């Protein structure tokens, strides 16, 4: 027989940003426990609301199946001595099984005959073990900071108030986290029944919705919020900004979602939209509304947790709450514009970037020089890049950014425009932080790209230079910064070398007395290795296999755009028919050369070529070396590898017909030199011997 099983944990308000993660982990953990206990079922569905976590298991077996457990003993040859008496090993094994050696069965395998003990183990009722399984599942939740409550010694993410466990209509007796199982379920704080009893698991979650006015189904609440918010925005001729992270958070904050539309005074639209949106989304969890051409409307959509008979009062209340915050933004904006950005530059002397690396003014000076250097390399306007670098951090000293920290950069852009700075300079103040996350937009022009790379490289080199390279944690977000630099270079195809960039960045940490702020002598090598290491994760995310990435990394190309061309070329080569054989041949050549402790010749001695196969290969290698020079010079690695694939037949013939390690030293050295020349052709692109089948 199988029944529906329900477990609901009633708690105090759970952290909204963690609710989905907790619920999904609870379901995954419990399903794993059921599997380990060999309890059959048809599925586990999770439910989550601000004050509850619940699971419902469909068709859960009421009883574990009986099973035969086999315990193999020693081999018969080792279980008895020459006289046929049981050895100590056999006796000890039998004792552990609770039998005598004579009672053991025999098992014959292809490796011999063994003693065997078979025991029938009766399955336990699910009701007897499910409490322990649920407790283990909860104990495995990803809770960074568990808490205690009352006089209890148990810990959980929030205090637990109720516990309900039902198998069909039967109450499962037990205690988890210090709370005994009961049929009592809590409803909404302000609507429906505060508490009520549930008779069977099948009633959940419908009874909670009907009597308790709580939608326990997380995905249902989210779908309602999305659909109703889109309708509400359309009703006022707009489009709601339904960013998924915010939708998730709001879904986790409400038990009974009611979507409402409110407004604010149009005069606030004179303030940059980003500041208003920051207030609405960050502080109040409201959804901004835009026109089709991305202009902010004087409206916002919010989700109430109650179904009011007078929704206008709820709307007015939210409008009243947001108005002072918008007024603050307006005040800061007007006040900040009374001073130019450049006038705030000296104030950066009072802000520490990092104790050993100096002030933000020091960092600004370095960014200015490095941005100019990079701009020159990529053909961007040098003076505009330097100007943008000089102004890059000035908005950190404004009231707006001090109050609304996430507006850094974008407010700098608006203030720069107000001050009459060139548009490229203004854009760079915002785009210096791009890309902010994986998949984010890149800086839109060369000036912005130069400043963005300069800012990131200064941070990376500086932090590595004082010996604080990221290990587990990454407080300065150096991994993200490194990937940002690489993305900008690769996606714009800039001919930049990390060696040059890192060396230039390092040089700018020199102080007036000739010493450097940096104390790590290996900073250049460590930074380059760190940044190249970011390629591994990036290209794996792009779908390239690890061995392709490793094949390129083995050559340590330090020009990111060049690295990208190599990866794509090797990926294309791997699909060719000749790839597997040539990869194996390169591996074989590498192994042969590694064992040779002599000195290779400077060039092949044609007079020493004896076998037809080695003559053909030598000719092909010579022709290929000359033919591939243009492809190598221009970085056309795909064309080069496609041509190198033609060497498969002469390479195969060489290994089939030529004794490489000949007794004659001159012959051996000449053949090894030929193989080395062959391998070097491939190594100009990647170490294809690392490619897997």
Swiss-Prot record:
- Subcellular location field: Cytoplasm
Task: Give the UniProt record's GO annotations in the biological process aspect.
Answer: arginyl-tRNA aminoacylation; glycyl-tRNA aminoacylation
Enzyme Commission identifier(s): 6.1.1.14
Cellular component annotations (GO), alphabetically ordered: cytosol
Write out the entry's keywords from A to Z: Aminoacyl-tRNA synthetase, ATP-binding, Cytoplasm, Ligase, Nucleotide-binding, Protein biosynthesis
Q: Which reaction does it catalyse?
A: tRNA(Gly) + glycine + ATP = glycyl-tRNA(Gly) + AMP + diphosphate
Concerning Pfam families, the annotation shows: DALR_1, tRNA_synt_2f
Q: Name one GO molecular function term.
A: glycine-tRNA ligase activity
Similarity annotation:
Belongs to the class-II aminoacyl-tRNA synthetase family.
Subunit structure, as described in the record: Tetramer of two alpha and two beta subunits.
UniProt protein name: Glycine--tRNA ligase beta subunit
Taxonomic path: Bacteria, Pseudomonadati, Pseudomonadota, Gammaproteobacteria, Vibrionales
């Amino acid at each position: 027989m199988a029944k529906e099983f329900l477990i609901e944990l009633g708690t105090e308000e759970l952290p909204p940003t963690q609710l989905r993660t907790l619920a999904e982990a609870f379901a995954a953990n419990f399903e794993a426990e059921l599997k380990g206990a060999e309890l059959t079922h048809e599925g586990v569905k999770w439910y989550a609301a601000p004050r509850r976590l619940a699971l419902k298991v469909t068709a859960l077996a009421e009883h574990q199946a009986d099973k035969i457990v086999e315990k193999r003993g020693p081999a018969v040859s080792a279980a008895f001595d020459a006289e046929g008496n049981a050895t100590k090993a056999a006796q000890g094994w039998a004792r552990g099984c609770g039998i005598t050696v004579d009672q053991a069965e025999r098992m014959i395998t292809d490796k011999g005959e063994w003693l065997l003990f078979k025991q029938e183990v009766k399955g336990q009722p699910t009701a007897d073990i499910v409490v322990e399984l649920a407790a283990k599942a909860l104990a495995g939740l990803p809770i960074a900071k568990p808490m205690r409550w009352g006089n209890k010694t148990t810990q959980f993410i929030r205090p637990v108030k109720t516990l309900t466990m039902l198998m069909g209509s039967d109450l499962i007796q037990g205690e988890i986290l210090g709370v005994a199982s009961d049929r009592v379920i809590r409803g909404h704080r302000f609507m429906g029944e505060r508490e009520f009893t549930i008779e069977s698991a099948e009633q959940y979650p419908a009874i909670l919705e009907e009597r308790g006015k709580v939608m326990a189904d997380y995905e249902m609440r989210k779908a309602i919020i999305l659909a109703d918010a889109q309708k509400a925005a359309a009703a006022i001729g707009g489009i709601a900004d339904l960013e998924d992270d915010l939708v998730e958070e709001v879904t986790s904050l409400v038990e009974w979602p009611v979507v409402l539309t409110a407004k604010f005074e149009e005069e606030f639209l004179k303030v940059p939209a980003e500041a208003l949106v920051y207030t609405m989304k960050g502080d109040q969890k409201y959804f901004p509304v835009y026109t089709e051409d991305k202009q902010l409307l004087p409206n916002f959509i919010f989700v109430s947790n109650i179904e009011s008979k007078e929704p206008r009062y709820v709307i007015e209340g939210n409008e009243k709450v947001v108005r002072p915050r918008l007024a603050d933004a307006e005040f800061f904006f007007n006040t900040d514009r009374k001073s130019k950005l450049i006038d705030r530059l000296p104030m950066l002397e009072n802000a520490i970037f990092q104790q050993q690396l100096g002030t933000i003014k020091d960092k600004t000076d370095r960014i200015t020089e490095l941005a100019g250097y990079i701009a020159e390399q990529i053909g961007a306007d040098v003076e505009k890049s330097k100007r943008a670098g000089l102004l890059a951090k000035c908005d950190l000293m404004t009231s707006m950014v001090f109050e609304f920290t996430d507006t850094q950069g974008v407010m700098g852009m608006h203030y720069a425009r107000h001050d009459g700075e060139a548009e490229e300079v203004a854009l760079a103040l915002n785009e210096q932080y791009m890309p902010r996350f994986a998949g984010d937009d890149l800086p839109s022009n060369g000036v912005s790209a130069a400043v963005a790379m300069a800012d990131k490289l200064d941070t990376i080199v500086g932090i590595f230079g004082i010996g604080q390279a990221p290990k587990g944690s990454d407080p300065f977000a150096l991994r993200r910064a490194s990937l940002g630099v690489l993305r900008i270079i690769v996606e714009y195809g800039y001919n930049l070398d990390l060696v040059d960039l890192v060396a230039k960045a390092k040089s700018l940490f020199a102080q007036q007395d000739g010493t450097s702020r940096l104390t790590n002598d290996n900073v250049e090598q460590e930074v380059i290795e760190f940044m190249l290491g970011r390629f591994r994760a990036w290209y794996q995310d792009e779908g390239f296999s690890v061995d392709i990435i490793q094949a390129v990394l083995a050559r340590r190309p330090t020009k990111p755009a060049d690295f990208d061309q190599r990866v794509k070329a090797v990926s294309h080569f791997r699909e060719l028919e000749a790839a597997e054989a040539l990869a194996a041949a390169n591996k074989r050549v590498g192994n042969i050369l590694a064992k040779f402790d002599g000195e290779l010749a400077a060039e092949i001695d044609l007079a020493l070529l004896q076998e037809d196969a080695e003559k053909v290969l030598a000719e092909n290698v010579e022709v290929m070396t000359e033919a591939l020079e243009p492809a190598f010079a221009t970085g056309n690695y795909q064309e080069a590898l496609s041509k190198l694939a033609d060497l498969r037949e002469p390479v195969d013939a060489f290994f089939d017909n030529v004794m490489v390690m000949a007794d004659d030293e001159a012959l051996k050295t000449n053949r090894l030199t030929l193989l080395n020349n062959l391998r070097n052709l491939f190594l100009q692109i990647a170490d294809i011997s690392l490619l897997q089948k």
